[in-house]
């Protein structure tokens, strides 16, 4: 069993960039440009970070202050803030650990460190830079904080004797902020990265390791289990607006699992609610996120895998669904939505990835367009059917120099005027932003 156990911590770290270790694997390179106009798109791109090894958060984690004035990023030395008005970079805290998220209520950035046998969650005040301990626990990892910053959510393997990150089975590759998913195919030859990842995910899923999802009450320090299963539980996300609504996924090959689930943490014995049910073999859904208003869960849907692409939405209160069709080149490793809910963004992908896009290495701004009924004639059951639409994709940044083993993880700034992303296009990993409006000279 041990050789089949893929480390849970490696999956968590996709979302949670480490402070210092990521710098170790960075390749020295010439100083990347601070600002330029993309010659293929006409959009302005700026570099927000100073040092290789800097990183913004995973696409569905919040890195912005509640007031929307600052972004927090990880650097080789710790955490820094970016003033979004001036782009001034300032150190926030220097401490080895893992950046978790920024609170939605207070101006606090949370990170986690290991002290002996204890996991310690700390918060640093973005203005005073004072650090405080907010929670301690023995095992597992923290993945989310709720809307009013009263609950942390995390996962843990139930049996402490199970080794979940054995050396030699799955080593981390800090250049790409995820595990080194190397594997051979049936012919003994190395598989492409995307296929090797599926093999390793499947091995971990088939191990059926008992797991628990837990919350820690930051007012009392109490830790309680909210769900237990032998499914591979991962990617916990609290709603940005409902403090007691938790989304999580069943990790593994997407065509093999029912990935998307919601769970209420304020109801005793609450059962998880499945968000999406497949209707065809090889249909996949994942890389889910909440809309900014917390009313909709959006996700990448493919019917079937690698052939037909959608940004799909599930309205939590009503169960109504919306599917926006995406053409192959615009399929993205991760999609995201703007603060006002009117636009989407995507970070593209290379030819080895699931879409096998011949020209997909771009960052995109995506304009959703609903498909109306013909001549205003409504089907009698139209209210109960999926609302269809299409995505009109606009290219923002040429990513031809980017290695997509590092996921760009696009996210909108709070004012909706920029997309922040990370990239190794100039060698070492840096944090960048692209302006959605073109400069007057480029229009």
Language model: regions and residue ranges:
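Blade-loop segments of beta-propeller domains
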Residues: 58-60, 76-122, 136-139
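Blade-terminus and WD-like Trp-Asp/Gly-His loop motifs, strongest in beta-propeller folds
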Residues: 61-70, 99-108, 143-156, 237-245, ...
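Blade/loop signatures of beta-propeller domains
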Residues: 26-46, 202-214, 380-387
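Beta-strand-rich domains and repeat architectures in extracellular enzymes and scaffolds
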Residues: 26-33, 40, 44-77, 236
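Blade-level signature of beta-propeller repeat domains, shared across WD40, Kelch, NHL, RCC1
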Residues: 406-443
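Structural motif
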Residues: 78-80, 117-123, 161-167, 208-214, ...
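Loop/turn-rich, solvent-exposed surfaces of beta-rich toroidal or solenoidal domains
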Residues: 295-310, 325-391
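Asp-box/WD-like beta-propeller blade repeats and closely related beta-sheet repeat scaffolds
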Residues: 96-98, 112-212, 225-228
């Amino acid at each position: 069993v041990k050789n089949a156990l893929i480390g849970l911590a490696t999956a968590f770290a996709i979302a949670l960039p480490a402070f210092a270790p990521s710098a170790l694997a960075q390749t020295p390179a010439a100083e990347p440009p601070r600002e330029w106009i993309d010659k293929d798109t006409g959009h302005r791109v700026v570099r927000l970070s100073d040092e290789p090894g800097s990183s913004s958060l995973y696409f569905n984690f919040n890195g912005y202050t509640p007031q929307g004035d600052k972004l927090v990023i990880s650097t080789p030395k710790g955490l820094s803030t970016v003033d979004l008005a001036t782009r001034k970079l300032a150190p926030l805290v220097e401490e080895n650990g893992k950046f978790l998220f920024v609170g939605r209520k207070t101006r606090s950035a949370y990170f986690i460190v290991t002290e002996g046998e204890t996991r310690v969650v700390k918060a640093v005040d973005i203005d005073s830079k004072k650090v405080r301990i907010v929670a301690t626990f023995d095992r597992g990892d923290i993945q989310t904080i709720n809307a009013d910053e009263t609950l942390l959510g995390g996962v843990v393997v139930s049996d402490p004797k199970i080794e979940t990150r054995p050396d030699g089975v799955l080593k981390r590759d800090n250049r790409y902020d995820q595990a080194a998913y190397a594997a051979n195919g049936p012919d003994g030859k190395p598989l492409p990265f995307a296929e090797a990842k599926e093999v390793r995910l499947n091995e971990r899923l088939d191990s059926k390791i008992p797991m628990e999802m837990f919350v820690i009450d930051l007012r009392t320090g109490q830790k309680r289990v909210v769900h237990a299963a032998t499914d591979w539980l991962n990617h916990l996300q609290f709603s940005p607006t409902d403090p007691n609504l938790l989304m999580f996924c069943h990790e593994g090959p997407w065509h093999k699992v029912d990935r998307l689930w919601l769970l209420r943490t304020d109801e005793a014995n609450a059962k998880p609610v499945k968000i999406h049910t497949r209707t065809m073999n090889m249909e996949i859904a994942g890389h889910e996120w909440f809309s900014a208003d917390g009313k909709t869960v959006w996700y990448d849907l493919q019917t079937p895998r690698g052939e037909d692409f959608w940004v799909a939405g599930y309205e939590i209160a009503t169960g109504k669904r919306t599917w926006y069709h995406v053409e192959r080149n615009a399929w993205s490793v991760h999609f995201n939505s703007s603060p006002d809910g009117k636009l989407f963004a995507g970070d593209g992908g290379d030819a080895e990835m699931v879409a096998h896009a011949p020209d997909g290495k771009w960052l995109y701004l995506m304009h959703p367009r609903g498909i109306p009924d013909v001549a205003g004639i409504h089907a009698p059951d139209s209210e109960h059917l999926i609302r269809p639409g299409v995505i009109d994709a606009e290219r923002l940044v040429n990513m031809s120099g980017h290695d997509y083993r590092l996921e760009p993880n696009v996210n909108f700034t709070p004012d909706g005027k920029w997309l922040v992303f990370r990239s190794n296009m100039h060698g070492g990993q840096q944090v960048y932003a692209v302006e959605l409006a073109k400069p007057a000279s480029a229009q």
